[in-house]
Amino acid sequence: MNNNLPIGSIAAAVDLLNKENVIAYPTEAVFGVGCDPDSETAVTRLLALKQRPVDKGLILIAASFEQLKPYIDDSILTAAQRKAVFDCWPGPVTFVFPAPATTPRWLTGRFDSLAVRVTNHPLVVALCNAYGKPLVSTSANLSGLPPCRTVEEVRAQFGDDFPVVEGATGGRLNPSEIRDALTGELFRQG
């Protein structure tokens, strides 16, 4: 079965996400692989694919801040901290927020926080809007290999049958910057 999704096949991607599958899609800099953040089965599949330990935690990517609110606690942010976050969104900056106790450990790992981003990539915005929630999102690459920047690279690393939403990345050279929403501390340079 060929699961490659032609560009614009958002409905097919949503169907695969609803079936707890992991899919690949273009983001601002590289292709990402993602899944339903509320499905432990889907997240376990993603972690196995990436050979990533669950304790490292994951990133959620969303079309809007509203989609992220069930997973984070922004109540302790000051007006200045909130402004610093919203000045960067939508865009390629990921912020680490406190996470409420209801956020699943398969997302937060060993942390009491969660990394989240509101994307400005039009295809991912459309995908998250059609799905109605954020996606777990991590770079599309197998352990020890560079992140994929094209559909062809995704197919080379993950196989011809891996479901790929075809499209172009946003042209950025580096993955998203990661900052603490409370302190502004830089965890990863973008």
Swiss-Prot record:
One of its GO terms (biological process) is tRNA threonylcarbamoyladenosine modification. The keyword Calcium does not apply. Residues 7-190 form the YrdC-like domain. Its EC number is 2.7.7.87. Its main location: cytoplasm. PANTHER family: SUA5, THREONYLCARBAMOYL-AMP SYNTHASE. HAMAP family: TsaC. This is Threonylcarbamoyl-AMP synthase. It comes from Salmonella typhimurium (strain LT2 / SGSC1412 / ATCC 700720). The lineage of its organism: Bacteria, Pseudomonadati, Pseudomonadota, Gammaproteobacteria, Enterobacterales.
